[in-house]
Amino acid sequence: MSSFLIARSRGVDMIALPVFPSRRLFQTELSYHVDSGITKPEELADKRLGVAEYQQTAALWIRGILEHDFGVSQYKIHWYMERSEEMSHGAATGFKPPAGISFNRIAPNKSLASTLLENELDVAHVASPWVLRANALDRSSRIAGKGDWNKIKPLFPDRMAEGARFYKQHGFLPVNHTYIIRGDIYRKCPWVAFNLYTGFVKAKALAREQLLERIPTALFFAPEYAAMTREMIGDDPFPYGVKANKVMLDAIIAFSHEQGLTPRKMTVEELFAQSTLDL
């Protein structure tokens, strides 16, 4: 979503659907090294914080939440980025660190996990430095590092409590991704946006009906956790549409501009297909 905002602010010919298949409470995935002296998020000023990529959506939400909810300015943190200049979203957008930001790159033979374990970072966006998903860009799954794993702790020991706090305060869960239509296709076939949106809405409804049936049976208390989640954030934690996501969209647009990723605040009319704006 962040790279899409950047691209649209530069006039890239594409349009989005208000369909958000992935949401995460990114701040709850931060881990810290106990030797950093950190005990709570308000103490991150002057600390070294590592993210996979500076411009990506996860890092945007982390910066915005740390600043607006915990009073830690992005300018008070020393930022470290794992992905290389070539292997990153920034390679496509021509990313340059915003003025005034303390920005550093992690050495190519190291990773977020290894630098955190070896106390070269105080905090990193890795929920578990020793259990990481492999992908084509991030190195932590291949370079786990050496160190005492017992010294790595979650910044938010009770992730569910922090999630409940955030949702109660803001009324939404942060989005990660959306779906994009090329501008030439949208102009040639404008009906495709509404039809795709309708299809995604129906698919989500079918998936939710079968949710508990698809949870592995090894997760013995899945129904109880599903009930807890429903009590915390309601029946639909993944709402689609512009109207249902207005507060969230206003927040991510504002964060992008505040953080110097976009030169101005975008409008939803610039971002989403016309036929979906009233949905």
Report the location of each language-model feature.
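Tryptophan-rich aromatic "cage" segments
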Residues: V247-L279
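Conserved aromatic-histidine-acidic binding/catalytic patches
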Residues: G50-Y54, A58, N104, Y240, ...
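Short helix-initiation/N-cap motifs at beta->coil->alpha
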Residues: T39, I77-S114, T267-D278
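Pocket-lining segment of extracytoplasmic ligand-binding domains
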Residues: S2, H89-L212
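Secondary-structure end/capping motifs
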Residues: I180, I185-E258
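Short, solvent-exposed beta-strand edge segments and adjacent coil->beta transition regions
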Residues: D46, P174-T178, D235-P237
